[in-house]
């Protein structure tokens, strides 16, 4: 009788439904292994066992079987950058509700364009030349994302200037390169704008420049054909 009782208890212990140890979900496993990693979303990808993690600024991936994290671009067989597409969708939702009160407004055209730029960025200056001839057609809402100390100083010069639009033209046009004298005031309003742009960039998840938001779509980089197509719609 005692042997039968022991056998029954062993069977009950081995049955999946009776086990006291429940198998963790991939997300629970991730939380346990990478407890310091803060994230907004944890979603499945087209690859079995690989999950997309978005931390508000960057997409990375979790391989549940190996319990490892990795960063990179996921490319489909037809050449689509699935990582870039997913990131653009997330940025789009944030940009759709973005307040532009602190953006530098340039132009007076019907089409509104939000742009994140660094004043020394080569492609940002190419986009400046492109939009500079279209000021009657578009209104730019400029948000700065400095990638160097010199860029930050040039942004401060713009914010410290009485005519910010002209200062923007001078800086992006290259007139203040070659160690030109900059207006680096300690004005609180300028400092507040510097902080506001920094906070907005962090909220949206900006990590490189330029980036544009045109007619509900995100355009990473100065993709002139894509921009021209959107403007023509």
Residue ranges and their predicted role:
Residues 9-14:
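Hydrophobic core
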Residues 158-162:
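Mechanochemical coupling/switch segment within NTP-driven translocation systems
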Residues 5-7, 18-156, 170, 181-209, ...:
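Extracytoplasmic thiol/disulfide redox context detector
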């Amino acid at each position: 009788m005692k042997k039968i009782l022991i056998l029954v208890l062993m069977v009950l212990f081995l049955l999946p439904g009776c086990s006291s140890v429940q198998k963790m979900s991939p997300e629970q496993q991730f939380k346990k292994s990478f407890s310091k990693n803060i994230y907004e979303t944890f979603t499945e990808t087209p690859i079995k066992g690989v999950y997309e993690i978005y931390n508000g600024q960057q997409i990375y991936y979790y391989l549940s079987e190996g319990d490892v994290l990795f960063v990179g671009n996921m490319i489909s067989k037809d050449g689509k950058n699935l990582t870039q597409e997913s990131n653009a969708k997330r940025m789009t939702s944030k940009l759709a509700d973005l307040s532009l009160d602190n953006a530098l407004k340039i132009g007076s055209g019907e089409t509104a364009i939000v742009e994140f730029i660094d004043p020394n960025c080569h492609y940002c200056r190419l986009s400046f030349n492109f939009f500079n001839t279209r000021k009657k057609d578009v209104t730019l809402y400029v948000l700065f994302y400095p990638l160097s100390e010199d860029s930050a100083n040039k942004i401060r010069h713009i914010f410290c200037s009485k005519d910010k639009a002209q200062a923007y033209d001078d800086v992006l046009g290259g007139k203040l390169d070659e160690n030109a004298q900059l207006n680096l005031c300690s004005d609180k309003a300028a400092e507040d704008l510097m902080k506001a742009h920094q906070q907005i960039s962090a909220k949206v998840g900006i990590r490189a420049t330029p980036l544009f938001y045109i007619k509900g779509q995100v355009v990473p980089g100065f993709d002139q054909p894509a921009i021209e197509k959107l403007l023509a719609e």
